[in-house]
């Protein structure tokens, strides 16, 4: 593989660059994400029992749902999902951070995890992927196989609406929380549909990829920040929109990271086969390559892309190496990080600005803090809560 070293680019060691040092899809948590035991306690005490009890009169249903939740969650690294907690704890007034509201914050984090998992369960069926995170996909091990897994995945995405009704219906921001989750569900399915249709075209383009990424990942990831801001008591639509814009870009970076790992990491390293290679997916890597390839490289690429033949997959990887894909990836991430930094500086809210800046620093610049970055957010964060 081509080395990431490039004299013209700064040394970056954030979460989306971990694969260069570890050669695999492993994410180190944000340095302030230290209370995951409390989060998982809420999952065990509240989320799993609530979801099981929706149809407790149906024989074997509660047991199936419990197994589904424990087997599939989290579908991706739960480090991505710290957005909701970071924003709430940093932005909400100390008086708002009661035990009840902290629990609700964890329920919002769980809401995002459930939506992520819905995406993964259905995506694995669509991609015909047998594995996720190094173990068999839910559709491979559940009773009923793909036929029932489809409905399991659909339920997973609807459980958040039930949780919101159970715990937020008397909150002033309830209707906005509900609307955000519904629109996230809709936009995600739009993005997934566009993504699958692109596999039939087998002609990856950046214009197509931007549409996929916006709906499938950008708006999806941004929903976590929107839910957290609303729960924190911010009612300014301008502030909410500006926050969503920043985290939409962050979500697009994360999706590009995932696309890049399909090229850069082996199936043993990232826990599943390279579905994008085999399905001719319109990913950032394939779309960027088509922008950069010479005519002869493009022809050779199209002859090999979308095949499970190992020699053809190797040819595609070699073509990516020829155009120095790691450098192109780094340039893309840095460009979008700079966009976010500009938007963050324009945020007219000090604590929200600190939360956004801290997340982007962790995502792109460094996985461990310098003294200044740790101190600034710690001043805003209710560390003892």
UniProtKB/Swiss-Prot annotation:
Mg(2+) 1 binds at residues 123, 127. Pfam families: polyprenyl_synt. A motif (DDXXD motif) lies at residues 123-127. Keywords: Isoprene biosynthesis, Magnesium, Metal-binding, Transferase. Binds 2 Mg(2+) ions per subunit. Pathway: Pheromone biosynthesis. Its cofactor is Mg(2+). InterPro entries: FPS1-like, Isoprenoid_synthase_dom_sf, Polyprenyl_synt. Specifically expressed in tissues lining the cuticle of the abdominal sternites of mature males. Sesquiterpene alcohol synthase that catalyzes the formation of (1S,6S,7R)-sesquipiperitol, a terpene intermediate in murgantiol biosynthesis, a male-released aggregation pheromone. This is Sesquiterpene alcohol synthase. It comes from Murgantia histrionica.
